[in-house]
Amino acid sequence: HLSIRRQRQMCIRDSRRNHLHHRKTTMTKADIQLVRALADKRGRTEHGLFVAEGEKLIGELRTSHLGVRKIFALEGLFSGPEVEVVGTKEMERLSLLKTASNSLALVEIPHYGLDMRALAGRLTLALDDVQNPGNLGTIVRLADWFGITDIVCSEASADCFNPKVVQATMGAILRVRVHYTDLGGFLRQAADAGLPVCGTFLEGENIYGASLPEAGIVVMGNEGRGISDAAAATVTRKLFIPPYPAGRRGSESLNVAMATGIVCAEFRRQASTTGTGQA
């Protein structure tokens, strides 16, 4: 009888342990207020954090160089001291997406140095007031695909840690360094250092007939007005993406993210056929 009693006590103790291990935590009002604050750039700057959502992205974040401060997740997705298990209704209250995700992480915003010497042998994108979060997120993803590790943005460009941008990058934000600076000053320094500064213009040279450098700066302009006069003054090579067939009147312009994809593809195509393909 004593043995049976001990077995019952052990079963009860194990059951309690399992319950404590898997029990849902109580999400506080402060948690919700913090996540809501991080939807705004001012809040992200104040707290030094950004929001990432979804099991795949958060899984990548946990193995990256970025610091994950806290994870809110449905039961069974993640484990660790930074993980708080919440229910579906709580996730719906927390999520910044239209359709609530199964997990949300608070991640420390990284700070990268911008070294012109390090960029000398690479292809780098420069964004002149690209303001749509979806466009910026797509461009970061394109940069990652084409092996471009740095994007230099004007200070009026969209914030790369905006939740919409983070989601649109599909994890590429972990591998591409995005810098914000006085773009005109940066481009002047690049030109003075002898780096080719290329940009897309309607009066530019047909990109498919141009001999493109393996390394340099590629400037992409604002969604509405294109490349500003200040940035254009530093461009040493004007390029043009022609329509097909040549001279046909159709759409007035290309979406900046689409144009960036075409330009990057042609730069990398030429690098892979004529050079080392390492820029």
Kindly give the residue locations of the regions a language model identified.
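Amphipathic alpha-helical repeat scaffolds
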Residues: 54, 131-139, 251-259
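Structured adenosyl-cofactor binding patch, chiefly the S-adenosyl-L-methionine
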Residues: 145, 160-172, 233-279
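RNA substrate-binding interface of SAM-dependent RNA methyltransferases
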Residues: 63, 111-204
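Single conserved hydrophobic/aromatic residue that forms the stacking wall/gate
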Residues: 1-15
